[in-house]
Amino acid sequence: MAFMRSKPSLGSLARVAFRWCGPGVGLVSYSQEPYLVKAVQGKSKPRSPHLTSPQCSPEHRPRRFRPPSASGRTAFSSAPRPKADVMGVADGVGGWRDRGIDARALLPGSDRCFVHAQKPTFDARNPRQLLSECYGEMKRKWKPILGSSTACVVAFNRSESALYTANLGDSGYVVIRNGSVLDRSEEQTHFFNMPFQLTVPPPDSNREMWFCDDPSEAVATRLLLQPDDLVLVATDGLFDNMPEQMLLEMLSKVQGVHEQKAIQEAVNRVVERAGALSINPIYKSPFCLRALENNVPYGGGGKPDDITVVLASVAMTPVQYRGGFQ
């Protein structure tokens, strides 16, 4: 019988070494623990007057918009906790603007996700609950925050070396291993370019008028990670303008790299490239191709949109423990 050797998971890679340090010092143990090296970058949708919107009605193409200073605000990345790393993005749906409502007001809910992730009760194995808590908080406000937003949250549980995900709408995540896509979220839409969304409608309106999806509808997954894996979380502004193969090529130089500066430079390049493609009038973007597949009139080119990306590399760090032997 032949046995195939596969690359072990982070859990099996964690090693403990012991060293006797002499009387009065005792036994010193060393172990390896996984963690994420993270970087964030954002770019706002261009406001150039010569840019034209795709030929879709507002009902079939809700626009996304935020002021230039707010693009990075849509991403949150919690400070590393003892047991988990959390990161994610939220993308306000801009179709509300036609009704006099600024959907940007809903985006601070992503900041609340950061707060909830810091609580001792936070369960890294259930990021969907994180969305539920933030959504419930927004609905309970004395003055409700009106609007809607897509969201993607991932939590890296260190003890299991597992990535737990919760994705609602057309934002999403990609996990890259050895230059190939290991796993990728699938967008949730009611129909073309109408994503699932967490909505807080006007209190005096008929709820049936709106797409009011629930956090429980977020797709949840679990995936074991290995050292050098890359985890990317982004708004649809990236995926609508950059094909998968181009993304893989741009990130190939940082596969296995754990320096924060290099990760930051890589995510900067990805966002800048996607932004340039979004305003290229002759570029056949992924969004353009999907529009044609769905028989939606589209003039061609990229899709001008806000772009927010969080990129992380899985690394191992040695941790030292001392015993008190005499």
Curated annotation (Swiss-Prot):
InterPro entries tied to this protein: PPM-type-like_dom_sf, PPM-type_phosphatase-like_dom, PPTC7
Taxonomic superkingdom: Eukaryota
Protein name: Protein phosphatase PTC7 homolog fig
Reaction catalyzed: O-phospho-L-seryl-[protein] + H2O = L-seryl-[protein] + phosphate; O-phospho-L-threonyl-[protein] + H2O = L-threonyl-[protein] + phosphate
Co-factor requirement: Mg(2+); Mn(2+)
One Pfam family of this chain: SpoIIE
EC numbers, comma separated: 3.1.3.16
Xref: PANTHER family: PROTEIN PHOSPHATASE 2C, PROTEIN PHOSPHATASE PTC7 HOMOLOG
One BP annotation, GO: dephosphorylation
Family as reported in the entry's similarity comment: Belongs to the PP2C family.
Keywords, comma-separated and alphabetical: Hydrolase, Magnesium, Manganese, Metal-binding, Protein phosphatase
Domain PPM-type phosphatase: 64-314
GO cellular component: mitochondrion
Binding site for Mn(2+) 2: D91, D236
Region Disordered, residue ranges: 40-83
Organism: Drosophila persimilis
Binding positions for Mn(2+) 1 per the UniProt entry: D91, G92
Major enzyme class: hydrolase
Residues spanning the membrane: none
GO MF term (any one): metal ion binding
Gene, per the UniProt record: fig
